[in-house]
Amino acid sequence: MKNEEYKKLSINEFTKAAGRYESNHAGIYEMCKKDYPDILAELEKEPFRELLDAGCGPAPMISLLAEKYPDRHYTGLDLTPAMIEQAKKKNIPNATFVVGDCENFPFENDSFDAIICSMSFHHYPNPQAFFDSVKRCLRPNGRLILRDVTSDNKILIWLMNTLEMPLANICGHG
């Protein structure tokens, strides 16, 4: 599957899931709460003012971080407009949400002190493009905090990239 085809599939499947992504059945918010302590521990090592959540979905991680650090600014980026609509409904006053591609950040150079990417990296068909965007948009001494699933098994990766989203929409995300 070509990169653009995969991105269209992602948008289609995550649009279907957007309204129920954080429901009790889906468990995404609970999964984010499990990642949150590790991400928070990394963020607490160095101060930050501007944070990007790449692949933010409906912004469960930004919601948690904004409660802890209400004096910081957060930007959420997601490819799926319906996910950004859900994030905006949370009315987080110190957050901005942008529809865009995590393989080509729509931001100025040196925009962020920290970039987090939690459980979305495996959906990026061109990982190097993501890292190039991170390098361009991180300020000097900025940090990338990346949490995701991984495997060396090419069949498992293919199954995850091809079947995960349609199955998750049938069975529930999380």
Describe the function of each predicted region.
Residues 116:
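A conserved beta-strand element that flanks and buttresses the S-adenosyl-L-methionine
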Residues 119-120:
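Short catalytic micro-motifs in class I SAM-dependent methyltransferases
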Residues 128-140:
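A short glycine-rich, Lys/Arg-flanked "PGG" loop and its adjoining helix->strand segment in the class I
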Residues 172-174:
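Short alpha-helix
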